[in-house]
Amino acid sequence: MWIFCLLLLFAAALRAQPPADHLPGTSRLTAAEEFSPLMVAGIDRALDRQLEETVAKRTRFWRRDPASPAAYTASVAPNRARLQQIIGAVDERRAPAVIEYVGGPDRPVLVAETERVRVFAVRWAVFEGVNGEGLLLEPKERVRARIVALPDADELPEALAGMIAGENAWALRLAESGCEVIVPALLDRRATWSGNPRIAMTDQTHREWIWRQSYELGRHPIGFEVQTVRAVLDAWAARSEKLPVGVAGYGEGGLIALYASAIDPRVDAALVSGYFQRREELWREPIYRRVFGLLKEFGDAEIASLVAPRTLVIEHSAGPKVDGPPSVEASRRKGAAPGVITPLTFAAVRLEVERARTLVAGVGSPVALVSGPDGAVVTPGSAPALQALLEGLGVPGPSIREPIVAPTVQARPDADARQQRRVAELSEFCQRLQRRSESGREALWQATTPQPGVDWAG
């Protein structure tokens, strides 16, 4: 009974005390602002800090051996394999590799011509159900080198071939200088065919539309387009006459040129224009440029180090400008990710080039940087940059020929139909891969040896 009375007295004493406004050993959390924005800002700062720290931490993934070109190439082979894996350039390309001329009764194979160059519409097999398409610029004189010229995503191959008045026809300049040139059509930044018309169309660019379908499958538009370039190299490698091979690109094409030359040692020299810079703010760029885990091991300088000891020319052009997703009609679903591409600054380009030069010091040719006076931008495919590319290929003979005579256009390929085929083929490839994934997973697990005492089927 006395215990019961004691408890009542203790409870009454507790009720008499004012309630505590915080737990012992703590202080009250007070702020004039909302806590959610504070939390987001803190996460933002933490991630920015981690991104900056990745640059120094990348060294743990690399074991470069500059003793000789062969030793260096062997020492970076694991890094090359990892880059190829994370961009999804892993699917077997179709064989035999053949460049096909495309034409018909109402579509001449020869689409344009100058005194020194013929231009043809072509295609080539890449994967099951996926083709590359574009233009072949064939010199009438003896061919001295072969080059894949990659436009920006919003440029047409016809522009680089001089078939569109007022455009920068740098691929034609290479062809006029004795190079066989193939200009592939890339996925562009329109949203015309992004979606399923039976369900809904979206405001996602074609690049984002394919990125979203491929990402969960371990694939990527970058990997698809790198493989498109490599399929051209396969076709050239099958020819009896062996010639130097180069890859050049501007904007999104510069990105593909950099990655393709880093992954495929058959590329003897590469030119990257309007793309190369520090990548620690990649999160600001369009989502279709994002590769899972990329910055942990690779910035542009590290990817450039995979090109060594071969020639790499960086051209400081302004690069494309993208303000965000495309404007579309109101009936479309709005779900495109934000992201911008801003013109490059010389300081950012030079800083990354210097980093690349440090990484490959003593190995082959240093990374070349072409710019205007005092770091001014140059037009993509400037004469000094193209000349440096040809020198890297070891091409003898005259310099880049000036001026260009505009070609006589016989027929203009249907660029819209070509782009629609590109989007549809890659979309179907991803969907087919998705349908086959379950059996692939089952095969993977069946090949796994269970540990003693573990019931995998349970």
State each model region's role.
Residues 248-257:
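Gly/Ala-rich beta-loop-alpha elbow adjacent to hydrolase catalytic centers
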Residues 142-244, 250, 275-289:
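Cap/lid segment of the alpha/beta-hydrolase catalytic domain
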Residues 2-12:
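Bacterial N-terminal signal peptides
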Residues 174, 260-261:
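Aromatic pocket-lining residues of Rossmann-like dinucleotide-binding sites
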Residues 240, 264-265:
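Active-site catalytic pocket residues across diverse enzymes, especially alpha/beta-hydrolases
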Residues 17-132, 142, 212-225, 230-234, ...:
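Alpha/beta-hydrolase-fold serine-hydrolase catalytic core, especially in secreted/extracellular enzymes
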Residues 136-140:
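Short, low-complexity Ser/Thr-rich regulatory SLiMs
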